[in-house]
Amino acid sequence: VPVGALVATAAALAIMIALAVVSVRRVCREPVAALLRSVPPRRGSVRLGVLEAMLVAAAAAAFIALVTGSVGGAIGQIAPTLLALAVGVIAARVLSAGLAAAGQRLLLAGRATSGAALLTASRRGTTRWLVPVVTIALCIVVVTADSLAVGARNWSDRAAAEVGAATVLTLDSADLSAVTQAVRSADPTGAHVTPVAILHPTGQDATTTIGVVPASFGRIALWPGIDTASLPWDKLTAPTTPALVVTGSQISYHVVVPAVKVVGPAIRPAPTSLALALRVVRPDGSLESVPLGTIPATGIDADQTVGVSCAEGCRINGIGILAPSGAAAVSGTVTLTQLAMDGRALDLGGAPSWRAPAAVPAGATPSGGAEVTAAFADGSVTLTFDNNGADKAFLAHASVPDVVAAFTTPVSTPSASAATFGGSYVDGSALLLGSVGRVAFVPGGPAAASIVNLDNLLAQGWRGRGSAELAAYLDSADPDVIATVTTALQANGIDVVATRHAAVLATAYGETAAAWSLKLALAVGILAVLVAGVGIVVLASTARRARSRDYAALRLVGQGSRGLALLAQLETAPVVVISALLGAAVGWWAAPSAVSMMPLFPTPSATFPLDVHPASAAALVAGLGGLLALTLVGVATSHAVARHADLQQLREAG
């Protein structure tokens, strides 16, 4: 063989080997992740396209306008959807880059199937459509579930707040004392029934006084959204001094009175006589001043006997002096000894049994009202008085409330700290109140209401007028329980004129036009899942040919059916799950803004504040249900694509 031929052959062989090396050198230098593709690789950038950026900006601007109140009403309810749209478009870009990075790490770790699946998912165009579809759907599901649960909660809570208890019996009696005794006979421990007095004011801007038994009212009344255990019930006090009750028809005593003094310039005529008097509460609760004898202005030292109408018992409310109307102001002292009722010694008690006038702080100006003080000794009492021109000057018994502690609603709370304000007894007479705590509302009461201890209202004036409403609150709607209580009340001469149930009113609220429009959210949520499911199927069908061809190639190189099915499912399931979780999070965050714009009631409540905080349980269950449903759809469609991947796909492609 000629040497030239050998050289030519060797040269040709070397050139062919060099060409082969050069041709595969670039491919060999590429990472495995870059070779696993059936389409040209996309850039790993998360930058948005022009149309995507415009869409995100418009959706974000609309959402901000909605939640800031620039737009409201029915249009405002789409705020979560707009936010989900913006988040979904951005997430589609970010998720593609994230899937690519995760796939590369899995390949480097030797997990070929899962790594290849994530890389393929990051490169498929359908992923960019799948993410916003699922994100919006799950956002709608969570918002609709939350709105339904929040609506149902508010229907129930508003009914509870407006009715006041599970069952409220309105009674035909205006006698609070009789009602209290009848209720206690029906339930001596107050475990299930409690009396309530609702005393509406005569003035439009005044507060409604609501008398309750604190221990049982806090337990039996319905307080949606309020932690009753945190309320300072111990501050709703009533006088602890026992009432001073006398029975008889004649009072006798010895009285010593020096000449009274006219106080200040005598612009008005000086009185020629005064009268010692008792202020008593009659058995019907009415308040009356009973004169006990005349006291000449020049003084007296004598025994006195006077008839009184207390055969059925009188509760002594105060002791003091009566003066003629329009007379000059006078002051003096009255000393009583040998005080007796029908010949029996009458003990007025000591100083602790009577309420001393409020002390005037140093440097402060006296109030200028009538003032009576008392000094007690064995068998005698000395009254020192200055009537300041008033026709009545009494020292009050300690069993009579002074400034009554009250829980007040925001409307009834005075603006000045520690200020007093006017309430009323059952008969409409004035009762001085002071706020010791605030409540958002009073169960069964109006917007301007004050809760007081019922015992204060039983001190006097316990027989009501037309605007006084006496009721019994029950902790049960059981007909047998209601019948038992009604029978016990009737046995005491008290009939039930009306019965209200919180559950019945809640049902009525749930059947209003506003409620039915809200209930349509259930159909919207279901429809959102169906549309998203159809979207997953359509996107899978769009990419089915390319995916089947890829899977057929893998089958050709020895990949088994189970491996192909797993790879196909891993392409779709992570995208669906991540998008669903993202949509649920968006819905959870945006739901309160949307629900606050939804009309839950035909008319707003004057007392109950709406509670739109998210309903955690309902939103979680709905979100998990939507996530499971869409994941199953994605897995099923991917499995179907993998099952149809056979070598025929490669022949068709060739």
Predicted regions and their residues:
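Juxtamembrane/transmembrane-helix interface segments of polytopic membrane transporters
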Residues: 579, 583, 587-600
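Juxtamembrane segments of multi-pass membrane proteins
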Residues: 71-72, 77-241
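A hydrophobic alpha-helix feature that marks transmembrane segments and, especially
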Residues: 21-24, 145-146, 524-551, 564-568, ...
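Alpha-helical transmembrane segments, especially those used as permease/efflux helices
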Residues: 1-29, 33, 37-147, 572, ...
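Basic-flanked hydrophobic alpha-helices used for secretion and membrane insertion
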Residues: 180, 193, 198-202, 206-500
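Interfacial "coupling" helices/loops that link adjacent transmembrane helices in transporter permeases
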Residues: 30, 35-40, 534-576, 649-653
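Selective detector of the "anchor" transmembrane alpha-helix that sits immediately C-terminal
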Residues: 10-14, 519-542, 578, 623-631
